[in-house]
Every structure is written in C-alpha cells, then in structure tokens.
Amino acid sequence: AAKLDGKKIYVAAGSYEIAKENSGVKIEYSGYSKQVEITIEGGYNPLSTGTDLTKRDVAKYTTAFVRNTSSGASATSNSLLVLGNQTNIIFDGCTFNGQYGLSDAGSVRAVFVAAGGGDATLQLNNCVIKNFNRGSDGGSDGGAAVKVSKGRVLLNQVEMVSNKATGRGGAITTTAANSFLFMNNCLLHENYAPTAWGTSIHAGNGYVCMNNVTVLGTAATGGNSITVNGDAYFMLANTTIVGNSGNPNGVFRAGKNASLVVNSLFAKGAGNRTIYAGNITSGGYNVYQAADAGWGAVATDTDYSSQTLPAATLTDGVYQWTVTGVIDEFATWQAVINAVKSFDATVGQQFVDWVGEAGFGVDQRGATRNVNKMQAGAYDAGL
C-alpha cells in the first residue's frame, strides 16, 4: 500500500484487457492508515511512451480498458473492476468498453464499488463507459456501468452509453444506505433496463446528487419502467431527463427518502408522463411536462405541458430547447446553491464543495449561464 499510495500511472492510447478468462481486477487493502490513492491517467500519444508527458490528447488518443469477449469475470463479481476497502482510485481520460452488443445476454459490468467498511472511492473524470451488459441477470442486480454497494462514486464529465441490464439500472444502481453517487456534467443515453424500474439509474438506497446531468430515457417494455428511479435520497440541480416510450411510470420517481429538485427539466419525449409523485420537495424553477398532480410543485415551477419540446436528441452533447414566454420565473445562481445546501446539511454541502460553487453557474458544456436568469436543465442558451 505504501508503495502505491499517491502514485500516478500514465497510460498511452491502446486497448488493454483487464477482464480475462474468469476474472477482472479487484483492488483492496487492509491495515493501512488511510485510503490508498492511485491515479490512472490516459490519453497519451504511444510514441511518447517513457519519454514525454506533454503529448496528451484524450480526444485523439483513446486509452481503453476492455473485457476479453470470452470473459464473464465470475471471480470478480462479474465486474471488470472491483473496489474494496481502503481504496481511492481515480481514472482520468479513460474509456471502459465491455464489448457487448445490446442484444447480448451478457454478465459483466464495468465497476463494482463494494467496500465492506464503506471506505472505497471511485473517481472518474472525462471518461466513457460503454457496451457493458448485465442482460443475463434476474433483474435485481443491474448497474451495467457502475454498481455502488458501499462507498463513494464521483463522476465528472462522464458519458455512459449503450449499457444494459435486465432490470433496475441499465447504467447505474446503488444498493446500500452508505452509497454515495455524485455526478457533475455527465451524459447518460442509450442505456437499457427493459423489464423493470430504472432504465438508466436505479438508486435503491443511499444518496444521489446531480448537477448539469443529461439523461435521455430509453425505450422499455416493463409496465413499471421509469428512467431514473429509486428509494434513495435524490438531489437534482440543473439536470435534464427526457422520457421515451415504454416507460409508463415516467422519467423520475423518488419513492421513499426525502428528495429535492431545483432548476431542472423533465420532458416527456416520446413518453406520456414525467414526474411520479413521491417524496419530492421542489427547490423551485423546475420546468416539467405531464407530471403527476401533487408531485410537489411550487409557485416558481412551470408546467410546460402546453408546449412542444424537441425529440430526445443530442446537440453538442446536450438536449437543447428554447424557452418560451410561458416561463416567467427563473433561477438565480445563488438560489440554486442555497437549494442544494438545504437538501441535507452534510451531504448537500459536500456536493457543493465537490462541484465548486462556480460549477452551478455554467451548463453541462461549460457555457456560462446568466447568474440572474438561468435556464432550467443541463443546457443554457445564455438568457
């Protein structure tokens, strides 16, 4: 542990198999004085290997950690990577590729955060998770991209695409009370859980906090399907969720624990319902269509059901839409920050500290918002 703690590993572009035969990689420590922090930084020009750390371009030089197509990784909980106790693993500029097709009945997820002591942390910055598949599970063990049992997952500028579980979390699932999922400037699209509940995210427990996140709902077939779902404590700020067909329970449901939404957009897309009435408090300035009556709207929220919004498509990595005169209440930067802090005295402040207050004054693309007139959702046209 002492030899690796604080180390940074620089990885050139290329495809690296870390799930072979019946095993992925498990990292776990015990008896050390703290979490062992290891950083893996990708995106380097292979020609500079061993000589030059300035030749880095994540968009041009893809560092991919992949599953061998014959591997089910059964020895590591059907996961490419498992994080156990006393770990703080940071990936920057990396791609995780399960190499499954959506029609496959696969078994392997990307990352399982499963510290028995709850002291595991996964940090992803400027990363992509794609083509993982839990289609062979029974419907209760989803989270094809990330499953959080105990620990913290911090996702900044992460794209999750084309991941699949049978049910409960096509991309992400959380299961324990001490699961913490923080997301900033993230995009989730084309993730599937066709039979039940969270087609993109199923948070059964713990805390889920989002800022500047776009989730495009994907078609499902189950009668209880919904895009983002669970009994966790949710906090959604500056976030966009767009529905699709086959999700009759809408785009967002917070079923049990007290949750908060502020300055977010809930669009029905090809579906016919957005917010499922549950334990939700509005922090104001949300724009929504076809929500359940009594979901918790306040005077500064806007029912946008009379307006037509664009189809569920991405432009410059976000769902873009145009504000009409129906909306006459707009959030300020400070109002959003205050709402986030009010969500939970401890977790709300932790999330603000992690994002940084300035992060609530830009949109998902990094475009500057008008701090006195902010557009709802992850996209801001600069009103």
Predicted regions and their residues:
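Short, small/polar residue-rich loop motifs at catalytic or cofactor-binding pockets
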Residues: 354-356
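Short, acidic, Ser/Thr-enriched surface-loop or helix-capping motifs
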Residues: 363
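Predominantly extracellular beta-rich ligand-binding scaffolds that present long acidic/polar faces
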Residues: 19-31, 35-38, 53-56, 110-116, ...
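Glycine-rich repeat segments that build the extracellular carbohydrate-interaction surface of secreted
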Residues: 1-20, 37-46
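Residues within well-ordered beta-strands of beta-sheet-rich folds
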Residues: 8-12, 39-43, 90-95, 123, ...
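Right-handed parallel beta-helix/beta-spiral solenoid domain characteristic of secreted/periplasmic
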Residues: 35-105, 131-133, 164, 300
